[in-house]
Curated annotation (Swiss-Prot):
InterPro entries: AAA+_ATPase, ABC_transporter-like_ATP-bd, ABC_transporter-like_CS, ABC_transpr_LolD-like, LolD_lipo_ATP-bd, MacB-like_ATP-bd, P-loop_NTPase. This is Lipoprotein-releasing system ATP-binding protein LolD. SUPFAM superfamilies: P-loop containing nucleoside triphosphate hydrolases. GO terms for biological process: lipoprotein localization to outer membrane; protein localization to outer membrane. ATP binds at G41, S42, S43, G44, S45, G46, K47, S48. It comes from Haemophilus ducreyi (strain 35000HP / ATCC 700724). It is found in: Cell inner membrane.
Amino acid sequence: MTELLRCEKISKFYEEGSQSVQVLNDVSFTINTGGLVAIVGSSGSGKSTLLHILGGLDKPTTGEVWINRQSLQQLSANQLAELRNQQLGFVYQFHHLMADFTALENVMMPMLIGKQNKREAADLAEKMLQAVGLQHRICHRPAALSGGERQRVAIARALVNKPALVLADEPTGNLDQKTTESIFELIKQLNIEQNIAFLLVTHDLKLADKLTRRLIMADGVLREAS
């Protein structure tokens, strides 16, 4: 398997007044193409901070991240934005859909940002919404959708550019068990069919156990589950 993501000796400090607070401590690991990886840990352990750094949304104090052999720390702002748009997908606990746009328009957005033709973007967005079982909801705005439907739209948006890696921060945290199971089945299906790698941050140990690899974050230190 091909190495997709490499994270080496990542540490992160935040300044709080005269004190320096360490959130991540010398974190190193890799993910291969098509990997299904979970990171579990208590609140405040550094999981979300790590995910933001891996996605180029935050910078480490020390250390380096590579995606497809490109160092995020060596990219310009424009190059980093292009990499995020083309190679990464993001799913959050809160869907972050734009309230004034339909499900279709929300899913089209990453392609429009990438300057794709509007008609082609609409066609691809509709196909992706069909893939997540929402072909009957494409013209609905987020307020008219259930929590599970909104999260499915968010997943469709994350996947529409066919990223190599999806970073998901508590993607099922606000969902009931039945919806959580359906979301996982969707992730597994897309992983198999499109070889997309997923890195999920979750408190749900049952969900984490279904993935092929589990990492544990505690006090900013990451280790493999035994």
